[in-house]
Amino acid sequence: MSKRETTKYKIDRRMGENIWGRPKSPVNRRDYGPGQHGQRRKGKLSDYGVQLRAKQKLKGFYGDISEKQFHKTYVEAARRRGDTGENLIGLLESRLDAVVYRAKFVPTIFASRQFINHGHVNVNGRRTNIQSYRCKPGDVIEVREKSKQLVLVLESVQLAERDVPDYIEADHKQMKATFTRIPAFADVPYAVQMEPNLVVEFYSR
């Protein structure tokens, strides 16, 4: 198991939930956190603890991005007109690593970040290796020609455990996808309950 796979499953165990809906997640077999003290009974969380957990779960879902980067995204969401929680989800789902993952070009969000970093992705015909690149409606994301036959990609598009959401039009024959719109929170197919409102409360303290 790779280091990133270990990290991914550690996030699942820490949250006590299979946050990506993966069949191999260890929480499918046990419901306690990682480490030797993981089986200790958990006390009731304070309001702060509940808010922190909601933030950590959402941050973890997107590849456990850094706190600095996540907070920066929140600040941008808060500055925009409309509901801050909705804005936050829209910004996170607009990230290139999220779009590549949602389009099923790769099996996990962690693989997506590495895939982009290694230069396997074009956006509107140009090679892009920035994971946090903000996709705009109409942007065309494509696996580069030399990368289309990678086993990782060929196996990923066959995954039955998740579908491509309707705000992304994916052509798996051409290995190309169009980001059609910024989704609302209700449109995003999370495997577990996410609570962006609690994330907003956390940062508003």
From Swiss-Prot:
<dbReference type="Pfam" id="PF00163">
    <property type="entry name" value="Ribosomal_S4"/>
</dbReference>
<dbReference type="GO" id="GO:0019843">
    <property type="term" value="F:rRNA binding"/>
</dbReference>
<comment type="subunit">
    <text>Part of the 30S ribosomal subunit. Contacts protein S5. The interaction surface between S4 and S5 is involved in control of translational fidelity.</text>
</comment>
<keyword id="KW-0694">RNA-binding</keyword>
<dbReference type="GO" id="GO:0042274">
    <property type="term" value="P:ribosomal small subunit biogenesis"/>
</dbReference>
<dbReference type="GO" id="GO:0006412">
    <property type="term" value="P:translation"/>
</dbReference>
<dbReference type="InterPro" id="IPR022801">
    <property type="entry name" value="Ribosomal_uS4"/>
</dbReference>
<keyword id="KW-0689">Ribosomal protein</keyword>
<comment type="function">
    <text>With S5 and S12 plays an important role in translational accuracy.</text>
</comment>
<dbReference type="Pfam" id="PF01479">
    <property type="entry name" value="S4"/>
</dbReference>
<dbReference type="GO" id="GO:0015935">
    <property type="term" value="C:small ribosomal subunit"/>
</dbReference>
<dbReference type="GO" id="GO:0003735">
    <property type="term" value="F:structural constituent of ribosome"/>
</dbReference>
<dbReference type="InterPro" id="IPR018079">
    <property type="entry name" value="Ribosomal_uS4_CS"/>
</dbReference>
<comment type="similarity">
    <text>Belongs to the universal ribosomal protein uS4 family.</text>
</comment>
<keyword id="KW-0699">rRNA-binding</keyword>
<dbReference type="InterPro" id="IPR002942">
    <property type="entry name" value="S4_RNA-bd"/>
</dbReference>
<dbReference type="InterPro" id="IPR036986">
    <property type="entry name" value="S4_RNA-bd_sf"/>
</dbReference>
<dbReference type="InterPro" id="IPR001912">
    <property type="entry name" value="Ribosomal_uS4_N"/>
</dbReference>
<feature type="compositionally biased region" description="Basic and acidic residues">
    <location>
        <begin position="1"/>
        <end position="16"/>
    </location>
</feature>
<comment type="function">
    <text>One of the primary rRNA binding proteins, it binds directly to 16S rRNA where it nucleates assembly of the body of the 30S subunit.</text>
</comment>
<feature type="domain" description="S4 RNA-binding">
    <location>
        <begin position="94"/>
        <end position="157"/>
    </location>
</feature>
<feature type="region of interest" description="Disordered">
    <location>
        <begin position="1"/>
        <end position="46"/>
    </location>
</feature>
<keyword id="KW-0687">Ribonucleoprotein</keyword>
<protein>
    <recommendedName>
        <fullName>Small ribosomal subunit protein uS4</fullName>
    </recommendedName>
</protein>
<dbReference type="InterPro" id="IPR005709">
    <property type="entry name" value="Ribosomal_uS4_bac-type"/>
</dbReference>
